[in-house]
Amino acid sequence: MFIQLLILSYAILLQLIATQVADKQLPNLTKQCEPTSQTIYDFHVPTLDGSEKSLAEYRGKVLLLVNVATYCAYTFQYNDFNPMLENNSNGTLKILAFPCNQFLLQEPAENHELLNGLKYVRPGNGWEPHGNMHIFGKVEVNGDDHHPLYKFLKEHCPQTVPIIGDRHQLMYNPIGTNDIIWNFEKFLIDKKGHPRYRFHPSAWVQGSVIAPFIDELEREI
């Protein structure tokens, strides 16, 4: 019995070490998604003009999905999106942005106002999205009315931090343990439509945190 317990303890220790090593291979505030046979191609999302668009139109592309807001401390990241896409010479990368007003009401604009807000207010200075960046209609990413796409992403990609935030800043119910934590959280999708990585809003540094993961997925067949 003692030997069996010793072997079991050793096996558990090896598993813990393997898990710790795997975690250390990822930057802080980055999580790997769980494998799933379902893809984002099963979903339709609202556009700025009120119509619906199938995400199946993005087959074969590496996708960076991000929930955005105009009046957020992370809004400066918009200034990094266009250079990131310009440097993607093969055009494989697409950025899909989903405006959301659930975090301290930092996206109050109506759909028809969003692009002008970005152009003239924040980030301002005439900012317009690159041709490979698509800004969709407003959605909810948490709570009872979360969009099915975000329900799917949260089910298969673990939370990047143990604490979500202050309750009074979250404009939805109920609060879930795997909720989107704030504006500009990101999901990286491979060329077959599977979610692969989840990134905390602050895991950015002008896109340099995410760039190696994009390169990895672009190399995949």
Curated annotation (Swiss-Prot):
Glycan-linked positions: N28, N87, N90
GO biological process, one term: response to oxidative stress
Originating species: Dirofilaria immitis (Canine heartworm)
Superkingdom of source: Eukaryota
Residue pairs linked by disulfide bridges in the UniProt entry: none
Record GO cellular component, one term: extracellular region
GO MF entries: glutathione peroxidase activity
Protein name: Glutathione peroxidase
Family per record: Belongs to the glutathione peroxidase family.
PANTHER family: GLUTATHIONE PEROXIDASE (PTHR11592), GLUTATHIONE PEROXIDASE-RELATED (PTHR11592:SF88)
Signal peptide limits: 1-19
